[in-house]
């Protein structure tokens, strides 16, 4: 079991520190770390770790870890912080609805972070590839919503 735990840790570290876009690339990286495994084993490991693919800064789709097990990336910002600082485009309001425009591939993870925060202003979100629709609570003001969102998306102001 120790071998598997070490392998899972290695997978998390590789995904957190490098842009890996395919299982083949990940198998090569693991091989360089001394792990010998099949594509089927790697596939099961990725499923167990709940690894997904998301657009990177250059538009390439790469493996990412869920937020709760994300290791600190090399550099000053975590992947989540980089995403929030660079993916946001605009925020507009209409009645009890707000719309956030993002770069392609960013909306889903931003909506996930919004939905996982306790909010007195937002009931929920619906996300596409580059757009998030927010349903606002009765009486929520644009100022209050913008303040709440600034806790998640720092460059929203």
UniProtKB/Swiss-Prot annotation:
GO molecular function list: arginine binding; DNA binding; DNA-binding transcription factor activity
GO BP annotations, alphabetical order: L-arginine biosynthetic process; protein complex oligomerization; regulation of arginine biosynthetic process
Pfam family, one: Arg_repressor
Function: Regulates arginine biosynthesis genes.
Protein name stated in the entry: Arginine repressor
Pathway(s) where this gene product acts: Amino-acid biosynthesis; L-arginine biosynthesis [regulation]
Family to which the UniProt record says this protein belongs: Belongs to the ArgR family.
Organism lineage: Bacteria, Pseudomonadati, Bacteroidota, Bacteroidia, Bacteroidales
Gene3D superfamilies noted in UniProt: 3.30.1360.40, Winged helix-like DNA-binding domain superfamily/Winged helix DNA-binding domain
Subcellular localization, as worded in the UniProt entry: Cytoplasm
Keywords: Amino-acid biosynthesis, Arginine biosynthesis, Cytoplasm, DNA-binding, Repressor, Transcription, Transcription regulation
GO CC annotations, alphabetized: cytoplasm
Listed transmembrane segments: none
């Amino acid at each position: 079991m120790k071998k598997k735990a070490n392998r899972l840790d290695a997978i998390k570290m590789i995904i957190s520190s490098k842009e890996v876009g395919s299982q083949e690339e990940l198998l090569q990286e693991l091989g360089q770390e001394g792990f010998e495994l099949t594509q089927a084993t790697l596939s099961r490991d990725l499923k167990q770790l709940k690894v997904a693919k998301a657009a990177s800064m250059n538009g390439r789709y790469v493996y990412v870890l869920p937020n709760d097990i994300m290791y600190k990336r090399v550099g000053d910002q975590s992947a989540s912080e980089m995403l929030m600082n660079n993916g946001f485009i605009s925020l507009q309001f209409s009645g009890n609805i707000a719309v956030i425009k993002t770069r392609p591939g960013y909306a889903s993870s931003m909506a996930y972070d919004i939905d996982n925060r306790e909010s007195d202003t937002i009931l929920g979100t619906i996300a596409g590839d580059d757009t998030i629709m927010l349903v606002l609570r009765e009486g929520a003001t644009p100022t209050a919503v913008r303040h709440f969102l600034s806790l998640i998306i720092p460059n929203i102001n």
